[in-house]
Regions:
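Short internal beta-strands
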Residues: 37-44, 221-225, 351-354, 373-383, ...
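Residue-level signal for inorganic ion chemistry
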Residues: 31, 78, 101, 119, ...
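Beta-strand->loop->alpha-helix junctions that form or flank phosphate-binding loops
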Residues: 42-43, 64-67, 102-106, 238-256, ...
Length: 467
């Protein structure tokens, strides 16, 4: 089916969206314009939807809100938001009753006429996706960037040409239901994550593996040789597999002990050519190089490495005040991301603002690293978390620190705040000239904010307001 045929088929169809997001609006507007009757279902009350709810009503969508939002699903097609569990009993019942249960990204994959590069993993997805997109743009390609990053892609599907490329970031929530794989699949790494939603680690890993399981012999898979869970996925690949490594020579991109980056035997550039800091960003570049090798030149790879400034909320420099440098690493939504990001960068102890919603992942290793790397730990936990998020991660982080074998009483100093303004104030009072302060939550922000980006924006505003 072509994109035009898909949109023509919507006339007279009843379509429901489960889970409200501003990203739904362009698609709902298009569906309405093509004669579909659209409803939107969300567990939150209509009042809690705020501006999003008002915008949906203006488009003519019927709102079904509250605890019974999944009752009586009898539409022709259901679009599941990524945050809505695929295996909800109500969705399984809908499937059994003949409802087509799908998602924006699944339909995009079904209709996309061009080559698709897709990136998943526990950490490094957005930077790797962005670097791939930048390299392909620099090589002269028209790039459609989306998924978990950028804008929704399905609303622009009719503008996508066969000679273009699509570059998408995919989460486990999106992948769990997908039955098509991209032309180029990248798994950056795998570690415990989102275990508050997935029933166990096996389900999480199996969801991630969907990015490669449906490839054919002409596909390409890129895997991290330094991460055991990721490297093991090589047993399930069907096309060409490239491994990347920061520790040893591989058939893909790898970095030598003296800081030179190669693809197989071919020299590309120096590790120091990469503008954005951190060993984890070297890994992100190795993954990106392995994904685009043969599609872009070495010159393009080097140029992007030297010029790309990175992505917002990823160890983003905010300002320097009174000799103290402030960074925003709000994207560090897991212990592993915190450890390979902010906590890997400095050979001196920093001031760290952490905390958020508990994803039911272990914090033991993070506790040890905090004891080694942090002088003051400011733990952020709201007095009243947002609906549905009862357990802040702050308590588990503190327990992991105090229970670490290398913890000494008072080192690190542990402080508590229930809002970002107070967290920034406490961090400033603790920091001395020459120090670094970083928002490095090691947890999602959903107990207080709509997203990690909103959390990072508020942190940035508070830091910039300091006098």
């Amino acid at each position: 089916m072509t994109a035009n045929e898909f949109y023509a088929s919507l006339s007279g169809k009843r379509i429901t969206f489960v889970g409200v997001g501003r990203s739904n609006l362009p698609l709902i507007e298009q569906f309405k314009a093509h004669g579909a009757a659209v409803s939107v279902r969300d567990k939150r009350s209509e009042a809690a939807l705020g501006e999003d709810g008002e915008a949906l009503k203006k488009l003519g969508a019927k709102l079904i809100c509250g605890e019974d939002y999944l009752e009586s699903i009898d539409e022709d097609m259901l679009f599941r938001a990524p945050g809505v569990p695929y295996l909800l009993p109500e969705l399984q019942k809908a499937r059994a009753n003949g409802v087509a249960v799908t998602s924006e990204m699944e339909v995009f994959f079904d209709l996309c006429p061009c080559k698709i590069y897709a990136v998943t993993g526990s950490d490094g997805k957005t930077t790797t996706t962005s670097v791939i997109a930048e390299m392909l743009k620099a090589a002269g390609k028209t790039v459609h960037l989306g998924g978990n990053i950028g804008r929704p892609l399905l609303p622009e599907i009719r503008d996508v040409k066969p000679e273009d490329v699509a570059v998408v970031e995919l989460s486990s929530f999106q992948l769990i239901s997908m039955r098509r794989s991209p032309n180029v699949a990248v798994i950056t790494n795998l570690s415990p994550n989102h275990l508050d939603v997935h029933k166990n680690m096996d389900e999480y890993v199996n969801a991630k593996k969907n990015v490669l399981l449906h490839q054919n012999a002409f596909g390409r898979t890129v895997l991290n040789a330094d991460n055991a869970l990721t490297a093991a996925c090589a047993a399930d690949t069907r096309g060409m597999t490239y491994m990347f490594s920061r520790r040893e020579k591989t058939n893909g991109a790898w970095c030598s002990a003296d800081g030179k980056i190669y693809f197989g035997d071919e020299y590309i550039m120096e590790e120091s050519d990469i503008r954005i800091p951190g060993k984890h960003n070297v890994e992100n570049y190795l993954a990106a190089i392995s994904a685009v090798w043969g599609d872009v030149s070495k010159e393009v790879i080097r140029t992007v490495a030297k010029e790309f400034n990175g992505v917002e909320h990823r160890m983003e420099f905010v300002r320097e005040l009174d000799g103290v440098r402030w960074y925003n690493d709000s994207i560090a939504t897991s212990p592993s991301r915190a450890m390979i990001g902010t906590l890997s960068l400095y050979d001196f102890k920093i001031v760290m603002i952490a905390g958020g919603a508990d994803k039911k992942v272990p914090f033991d290793e993070l506790g040890k690293v905090i004891c080694d790397k942090v002088k003051t730990l400011v733990l952020l936990a709201p007095e009243k978390p947002l609906e549905g998020f009862k357990t802040p991660a702050a308590g588990k982080i503190e327990a992991a620190v105090r229970g670490a074998e290398n913890y000494k009483d008072g080192a690190p100093v542990i402080l508590h705040a229930n809002n970002m303004k107070d967290a920034v104030r406490l961090a400033r009072e603790s920091a001395e000239p020459g120090d670094v302060v970083s928002l490095c939550p090691a947890a999602t922000g959903f107990d207080m904010y709509k997203s990690f980006a909103v959390r990072g924006d508020i942190y940035r505003e508070e830091v910039k307001a300091l006098k």
